[in-house]
């Protein structure tokens, strides 16, 4: 169990400045491969990954900076990257 105070659990530290336009790479989460370990949710520095009502994780691309920490922390490679198109 992770202490809630140890993570950003929702977008908000950049709420007035949507940081999604900074990306070079976009992380793509494959919920078929996901084992629900919550690493992506825990390690996202922007709180841009949220769990939906079905228990699947979704990336809020308005706030995702494309740092790919989520991809690096995923133990089952359920997150891949694609180059962002301008």
Swiss-Prot record:
Cofactor note as given: Binds 2 [4Fe-4S] clusters.
InterPro entries, alphabetized: 4Fe4S_Fe-S-bd (IPR017896), 4Fe4S_Fe_S_CS (IPR017900), PorD_KorD (IPR011898), Pyruvate_synthase_PorD (IPR053389)
Positions bound to [4Fe-4S] cluster 2: 44, 64, 67, 70
Keyword annotations of the record: 4Fe-4S, Electron transport, Iron, Iron-sulfur, Metal-binding, Repeat, Transport
Binding site for [4Fe-4S] cluster 1: 34, 37, 40, 74
GO terms assigned for molecular function: 4 iron, 4 sulfur cluster binding; metal ion binding; oxidoreductase activity, acting on the aldehyde or oxo group of donors, iron-sulfur protein as acceptor
Cofactor(s) essential for the protein: [4Fe-4S] cluster
Ranges of residues in domain 4Fe-4S ferredoxin-type: 25-54, 55-84
Subunit structure: Heterotetramer of one alpha, one beta, one delta and one gamma chain.
Name used for this protein in its record: Pyruvate synthase subunit PorD
Species whose genome carries this gene: Methanocaldococcus jannaschii (strain ATCC 43067 / DSM 2661 / JAL-1 / JCM 10045 / NBRC 100440)
Gene this protein is translated from: porD
């Amino acid at each position: 169990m992770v202490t809630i105070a140890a993570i950003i659990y929702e977008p908000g530290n950049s709420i007035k400045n949507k940081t999604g336009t900074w990306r070079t790479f976009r992380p793509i989460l494959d919920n078929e491969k996901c084992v629900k370990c919550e690493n992506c949710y825990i390690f996202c520095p922007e709180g841009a990954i949220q769990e939906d009502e079905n228990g699947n994780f979704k990336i809020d691309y308005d706030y995702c900076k494309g740092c790919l920490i989520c991809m690096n922390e995923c133990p089952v490679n359920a997150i891949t990257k694609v180059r962002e198109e301008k």
